[in-house]
Amino acid sequence: MTQMPQTNARVHAGRMAYHAGLSAEASVIREYESHGYVFEAQRWRGQVGEIDLVLRKSGLVVFVEVKKSKSFERAALRISPTQKRRIFATGEEFVAQEPQGLLTDMRFDVALVDAAGAVQILENALSEG
C-alpha cells in the first residue's frame, strides 16, 4: 500500500471538506425552501468576508452560517467571535445594496448539519447583544 505525500493528502482533505460543505449548504437551502424562503445566494463574497447562504422571505433578508460536524453540539462550537463579527459586517455590506439599505429587515441564523445529514436551524442565533 502506498502513502500519499503529505501535500497530496492535504489537497484531498481540502477537496473533501469543500464538497462536504457544499452538500451541507444544499441540505440547508432545501430546509429553508420547505418553509417558504427563497434562495438568493450561496457563498456571497464581500470585501470583509463571506456569507454561506442568503435567503429571503416576506421582505426579510436571512443570512445563514452553515456549520457541519459529527454532532450539532460540535458544529455549534465552531463559530468564533471573530467570525461572528465578520458575518455581521458582510451582512451589512450586502444590505447596503438594498433599496432600504441598513434599514432592511435582516436576521442572522446558524444552520447546523450533523454527520447523518440532519439539519437544525437556529434562527437569530448570531444576534448582536
UniProtKB/Swiss-Prot annotation:
Signal peptide: none annotated. SUPFAM superfamilies: Restriction endonuclease-like. GO terms for molecular function: nucleic acid binding. Transmembrane segments: none annotated. Pfam families: UPF0102. InterPro entries: Restrct_endonuc-II-like, tRNA_endonuc-like_dom_sf, UPF0102_YraN-like. It comes from the Bacteria. Belongs to the UPF0102 family. This is UPF0102 protein RD1_1191. It comes from Roseobacter denitrificans (strain ATCC 33942 / OCh 114).
